[in-house]
């Protein structure tokens, strides 16, 4: 009986540590970066991705909506297990070509950013990326067509093309 109780305690202890469903909303809450699977740093006035995020090797979802991030570092590829990246409502206007190496990326949310094109290297993501959200990005028709040609099998969310002057 004692042995069974000890085994149950050990099992429950391990299960309590690894919490893939836990959503972290502050870096202060993180004690072990390898235990972070979902990180939502919305509206934190960040100008860049904090360096400690790149050590979160098991990170599956990174939500940076509503910050002040204008560019991404090539270090973003260190997040090799990232499946969902949300950059909505940031003043970002381009993505680094090295992101084409993010083979696990399934969703890229760029809603209401300044992005109007993607690096040609992103063509390799056509078989793995499932959703590209470019709503409210003020894309011109030729910009939409270029993205469509680059990623033909990816589901895209965007507004009707606008040929409006700024």
Task: Indicate residue ranges for each PLM-predicted region.
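LRR N-terminal entry segment and analogous cap-like coil->beta motifs
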Residues: 31-70
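Sec-dependent N-terminal signal peptides
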Residues: 4-13
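Leucine-rich solenoid repeat scaffolds
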Residues: 116-166
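Conserved "Asn-ladder"/turn position within leucine-rich repeats
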Residues: 43-44, 67, 90, 113, ...
């Amino acid at each position: 009986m004692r042995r069974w109780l000890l085994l149950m305690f050990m099992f429950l202890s391990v299960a309590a540590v690894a919490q893939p469903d836990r959503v972290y909303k502050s870096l202060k809450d993180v004690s072990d970066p390898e235990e972070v699977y979902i990180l939502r740093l919305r509206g934190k006035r960040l100008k860049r991705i904090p360096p400690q995020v790149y050590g979160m090797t098991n990170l599956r979802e990174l939500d940076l909506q509503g910050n002040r991030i204008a560019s991404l570092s090539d270090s973003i590829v260190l997040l090799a297990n990232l499946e969902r990246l949300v950059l909505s409502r940031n003043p970002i206007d381009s993505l680094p070509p090295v992101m084409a190496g993010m083979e696990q990326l399934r969703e890229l949310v760029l809603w209401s950013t300044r992005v109007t094109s993607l690096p040609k290297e992103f063509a390799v993501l056509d078989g793995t990326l499932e959703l590209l959200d470019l709503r409210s990005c003020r894309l011109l028709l030729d910009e939409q067509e270029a993205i469509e040609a680059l990623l033909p099998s990816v589901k895209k969310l965007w507004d009707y093309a606008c040929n409006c002057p700024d």
